């Protein structure tokens, strides 16, 4: 068998807790469930930063955000940082991105040979936070309670329009690969189809909304009596600390979220169907994941931007050739996917120049053991004036922010993280070990100074660009109408045969 193809189907803001594959009692995710049933489900997979752009840059690069200065949603993803798309292209793969990756900066491809849609979010420095004025909201930043209060049903939104385009463009690219293969191009392919749902706004099409009733929707399982200092800052930042929500509003937003999870799941089904139609399903490893989760009212919090389980954990499912059927309990994270993809593609770590922070998950995916049981997270964006560090090791998760008391949870026995063990005498040794690790790995003050410096630089650059000192970086997919479909310089029969798949091959195939 030839080297397997790789297809990543990526959601935005999808907490695994709200999927059938991970045990939600009413979530309707049949396509994700089917992949989990025949493949490997990773039960302790984390993002490396609970915010869209930095999480995706860690995913693409296999490096923690502090290593590549990818701190927030307006950090440049530098062209000098190798990505898994670069490595796979070097290994002979065709590479394609359809959908969102939130690239910031002039490089809008980062190793993808083809990019078949624009992004849904801006590619400039406008969303740069200011740690010297942490109480000020970013201009045009929409993460507040308005999106919860305005949740509900609509036939169309900018997100629905986008994801429908992403799905179509991804399937068309796969069909073009099949056409090329029929002409003799045997190169394996690697595609990322990256959708915006179920990211807020929590607005769903009637088709998906009607899959659920209000009785299907659980209210948040845990709201603490008092909030830790970091949570208080996030609550202030998203306006949840002073904008009251009714039970009906919370239930409606959670219902719309579940509806959009089902909508995303339908996109997984469409991708699987197309892979089947082009004869590649048996030689394709499909990976389902997300950039981060969504608190969805748990602990009074919404969206992401923290390291509690609903925000920091992500689904991670692999299915395909030589992937075992089962569940992997080891802690892992999105930085592990770059070495995993290199492993799948037949490469080795010898290809890697700058150090990476991940390890290949292929042994776990094959049902083998892995001595590593650790995931690392860093949050360096809005609603905090200092870096926030997370270490998940075994059943324990430690959260550190310089001005705040530490947090330590046993997320296996206490999945709601209701009991902070940081000052529990029975866990004094573990808490001290985690604190020592943080001190050894990170210089908080130096990292903070570096972050503030780049924030200042980016605000200056953005002001200059807004004044006309540069062109916008938003990606425009190339398109030449003179070469599409049938044109007068083409032989109609040749064009018709080019687009037909499977090709005629001299016979009229009715199957």
Question: Residue ranges of each PLM-predicted region?
Answer:
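Residues forming the ATP-binding cleft of Hanks-type serine/threonine protein kinase domains
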Residues: 412
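Bilobed periplasmic-binding protein-like "clamshell/Venus-flytrap" ligand-binding domains
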Residues: 372, 431, 435-452
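Short, charged, surface-exposed hinge/linker loops at domain edges
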Residues: 447-467
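Formylglycine-dependent sulfatase
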Residues: 1-401, 406, 415-436, 468-511
């Amino acid at each position: 068998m030839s080297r397997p193809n790789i297809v990543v189907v990526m959601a935005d803001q999808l907490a695994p807790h709200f999927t059938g594959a991970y045990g939600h009692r009413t979530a309707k995710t049949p396509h994700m469930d089917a992949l989990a049933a025949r493949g490997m489900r990773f039960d302790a997979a984390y993002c490396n930063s609970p915010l869209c752009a930095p999480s995706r840059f860690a995913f693409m690069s296999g490096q923690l955000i502090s290593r590549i200065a990818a701190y927030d949603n307006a950090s440049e993803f530098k062209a000098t940082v190798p990505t898994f798309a670069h490595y796979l292209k070097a290994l002979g793969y065709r590479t394609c991105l359809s959908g969102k990756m939130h690239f910031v900066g002039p490089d809008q491809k980062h190793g993808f040979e083809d990019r078949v849609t624009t992004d849904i979010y801006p590619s400039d420095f406008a969303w740069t936070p200011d740690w010297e004025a942490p109480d000020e909201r970013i201009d045009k930043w929409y993460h507040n309670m308005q999106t919860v209060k305005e949740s509900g049903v609509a036939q169309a939104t900018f997100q629905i329009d986008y994801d429908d385009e992403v799905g179509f463009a991804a399937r068309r690219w796969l069909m073009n690969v099949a056409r090329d293969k029929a002409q003799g191009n045997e190169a394996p392919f690697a595609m990322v189809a990256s959708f915006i749902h179920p990211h807020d706004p929590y607005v769903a099409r009637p088709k998906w909304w009607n899959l659920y009733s209000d009785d299907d929707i659980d209210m948040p399982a845990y709201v603490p009596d008092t909030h830790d200092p970091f949570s208080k800052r996030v609550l202030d930042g998203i306006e949840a600390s002073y904008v009251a929500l009714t039970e009906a509003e919370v239930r409606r937003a959670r219902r719309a979220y579940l509806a959009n999870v089902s909508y995303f799941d339908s996109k997984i089904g469409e991708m699987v169907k197309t892979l089947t139609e082009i004869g590649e399903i048996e030689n394709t490893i499909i990976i389902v994941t997300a950039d981060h989760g969504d608190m969805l009212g748990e602990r009074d919090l919404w969206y992401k931007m923290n390291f509690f389980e609903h925000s920091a954990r992500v689904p991670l499912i692999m299915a395909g050739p030589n992937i075992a059927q089962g569940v992997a309990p080891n802690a892992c994270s999105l930085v592990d996917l770059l070495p995993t993809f290199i492993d799948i593609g037949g490469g080795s770590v010898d290809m890697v120049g700058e150090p990476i922070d991940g390890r290949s998950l292929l042994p776990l995916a094959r049902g083998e053991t892995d001595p590593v049981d650790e995931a690392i997270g860093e949050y360096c964006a809005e609603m905090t004036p200092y870096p926030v560090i997370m270490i998940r090791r075994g059943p324990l998760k430690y959260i550190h922010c310089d001005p705040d008391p530490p947090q330590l949870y046993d997320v296996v026995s206490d999945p709601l993280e209701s009991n902070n063990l940081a000052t529990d005498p029975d866990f004094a040794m573990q808490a001290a070990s985690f604190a020592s690790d943080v001190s050894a790995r990170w210089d908080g003050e130096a990292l903070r100074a570096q972050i503030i410096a780049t924030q200042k630089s980016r605000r200056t650059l953005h002001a200059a660009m807004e004044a006309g000192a540069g062109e916008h970086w938003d990606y425009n997919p190339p398109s030449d109408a003179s070469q599409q479909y049938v044109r007068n310089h083409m032989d109609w029969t040749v064009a018709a045969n080019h687009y037909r798949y499977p090709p005629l091959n001299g016979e009229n195939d009715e199957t």
